[in-house]
From Swiss-Prot:
Residues 340-351, 359-375 have a biased composition (Basic and acidic residues). SMART domains: ADF, SH3. The gene is ABP1. This is Actin-binding protein. Residues 169-223, 325-574 are annotated as: Disordered. It comes from Maudiozyma exigua (Yeast).
């Protein structure tokens, strides 16, 4: 049997108004409310009143009704709310079957905020006295009623029974034994105070007050057993002692800053002592010499030490690591600066890096002596620097072009032309012309680039020795670079190289003069051997043939496509809807379960499940 839901929303406004009057007590004439269904089974307020007995007698025996009342229990001024659900046996069967569920709906949403809930099925369940006792028990403690009730029985009980029982035997004993009464009183009086004291001890009135223990300041101590084994090794203690010891092999415990400061202090003290000893020796040796001039080396050394002392007073002392870092930084700045300013920058850095040279410039007498020494040191590194400029064309890295000699300024300017920031990604002229020549010599049969031979003949002869005078060891790795270059690009690059290399005949001038003679017949032999199958004899150039073989296979590959086996309707915007036997092309396997494809008929692109289709290729 289906339950019949209750309809309390149609007249919910009227029910709410009457309910607020009962709960809030704004209207003294309305202390209870009963809602009952009408002919359309819509619940609405049927009756209201102010008497609790009238409330209990107003329920209809043929309907399922619900009532709420505000009652003040006896002995209390606080009103309590009682909710009554009336379900008589004479009500319709379907309504009675759904009474439990509907009563919960009424109690939670329609008439909430009650103190007591009562379910009544006949008049015996609506007994006024029983309901009032339930309400009074729910109201809590009633102190006024308890005080009034306790005072009456205590007075009546103390006046009736105990007086008769106590006084009759005591009077008889005292009258019968008047002489012996003097002996027992002290005996009886002594135990009385003792018993009182015992009672007080039992009541714990003399116990000290309990204090709360703060476990943070006064924590509990571990209870150790009294048994202590003798002769047993405590492994934990031994391990803790071993781990607490520092390993002398470790140096991490030493503070590097403190160690460096200590070494600086010791070296400073040592230098000061040496200076003082030298000054004392000079003073003591001057009268013994008898006016002769002291050795020049000692004077220079003393003057240098004085300059060092002045420099240290004016500037804070720097560690060797700091001096090396400054020197390295300045060298990097020199390599990045212009070539014309490199020479003065190097001399300037040498003056700044030397601790003694900065202040020697201020002393007129020492200037001429140290300039001679500085000139010797400056002239010595010139040959290796000049050798580096000679080998510039053979080096790929642009960093080696940064330190030219003074004699080769125009040559270095021409070499560094293509290495401006805009041309960093381009190849060097000397390198690029070699690679196409060797490629054409080796790959004439495969590539068939006979059209590039005329520009090779037009290359000026003095430039050729420079190209082949470069080391031939790095040629095999270079063969792999120009393979993807097209013919048109090679011709344009060769023309640019001819223009750049024409005004630079000075580079091959340092190479041996007889080198061009054996190279000319080599070119003729290469031209003659071009039609001959010379490639198989050289096994060093295998990459080009596999590239040619792979190229025709790429256009033959077809994009994956599939045929739908079932109809599928998209569940989201990024999915694809298709019918059975539809063709899906351009499939991308983004996942094992979901693929990305394009519908051939409409061109719509989206995701679809892989188990709905069958791949065609």
């Amino acid at each position: 049997m289906a339950l019949e839901p209750i309809d309390a929303t149609t007249h919910s406004r009227d029910i709410e108004q009457e309910y607020q009057k009962v709960v809030r007590g704004t209207d003294n004439d309305t202390t209870w409310l009963i809602i009952s269904p009408n002919t359309q089974k819509e619940y609405l307020p049927s009756s209201t009143g102010s008497s609790f007995s009238d409330f209990l007698q107003s329920f209809d025996e043929t309907k399922v009704e619900y009532g709420i009342a505000r009652v003040s229990p006896p002995g209390s001024d606080v009103g309590k709310i009682i909710l009554v659900g009336w379900c008589p046996d004479s009500a319709p069967m379907k309504t009675r079957a759904s009474f439990a569920a509907n009563f919960g709906t009424i109690a939670n949403s329609v008439l909430p905020g009650y103190h007591i809930q009562v379910t009544a099925r006949d008049e015996d369940d609506l007994d006024e006295e029983e309901l009032l006792t339930k309400i009074s028990n729910a109201a809590g403690a009633r102190y006024s009623i308890q005080a009034a009730g306790n005072s009456v029985p205590t007075s009546s009980a103390s006046g009736s029974a105990p007086v008769k029982k106590v006084f009759t035997p005591s009077l008889a004993k005292k009258e019968s034994e008047p002489k012996k009464s003097f002996v027992p009183p002290p005996v009886r009086e002594e135990p009385v105070p003792v018993n009182v004291v015992k009672d007080n001890d039992a009541d714990d009135w003399d116990e000290p007050e309990i204090k709360e223990r703060n476990f943070e300041t006064n924590p509990l101590s571990d209870n150790k057993p009294a048994y202590e084994p003798i002769g047993k090794i405590d492994l934990k203690k031994v391990i803790a002692e071993e781990t607490a010891k520092e390993d002398p092999r470790l140096i991490n415990r030493i503070d590097p800053s403190a160690d460096i400061a200590h070494l600086k202090q010791e070296s400073k003290i040592h230098r000061d002592n040496d200076l003082d000893n030298l000054l004392k020796q000079e003073k003591t040796s001057s009268p013994a010499v008898g006016g002769t001039k002291p050795p020049l080396v000692n004077l220079i050394f003393v003057e240098m030490i004085i300059v060092i002392r002045l420099y240290k007073v004016s500037r804070p002392e720097k560690s060797p690591a700091q001096l090396w870092a400054e020197k390295k930084m300045k060298q990097n700045q020199q390599s990045d600066s212009a070539q014309e300013e490199q020479k003065p920058v190097e001399t300037k850095t040498e003056i700044e890096i030397g601790v003694d040279n900065s202040d020697e410039m201020k002393i007129g007498d020492l200037k001429s002596r140290f300039e001679k020494l500085g000139a010797e040191t400056e002239t010595e590194p010139e040959p290796p620097v000049q050798w580096e400029t000679d080998s510039i064309p053979t080096v790929v890295k642009p960093q080696t072009f940064g330190q030219p000699a003074a004699n080769s300024k125009p040559a270095t300017q021409e070499v560094k032309k293509p290495f401006t920031p805009s041309n960093i990604g381009q190849r060097l002229p000397g390198m690029h012309t070699e690679t196409p020549e060797h490629e054409e010599e080796d790959n004439d049969d495969d590539w068939g680039e006979d059209e590039d031979e005329p520009p090779k003949r037009n290359i000026p002869p003095p430039v050729m020795p420079a190209r082949e005078s470069a080391p031939q060891q790095p040629l095999p790795p270079r063969n792999t670079e120009p393979e993807p270059v097209e013919e048109g690009e090679e011709e344009e690059e060769e023309e640019e190289e001819e223009e750049e290399e024409a005004p630079a005949p000075s580079l091959p001038s340092r190479n041996a003069a007889p080198e061009p003679e054996p190279e000319q017949p080599q070119e003729e032999e290469e031209e003659e051997e071009a039609p001959a199958p010379s490639l198989p004899s050289r096994g060093s150039v295998p990459p080009p043939p596999p590239q040619r073989a792979v190229e025709p296979e790429e256009p033959a590959a077809e994009a994956p496509w599939a045929t739908a086996e079932y109809d599928y309707e998209a569940g989201e915007d990024n999915e694809l809807t298709f019918a059975e036997n539809d063709k899906i092309i351009n499939i991308e396997f983004v996942d094992d379960d979901w693929w990305l494809g394009e519908l051939e008929t409409t061109g719509q692109k989206g995701l679809f499940p892989s188990n709905y289709v069958v791949l065609g290729n």
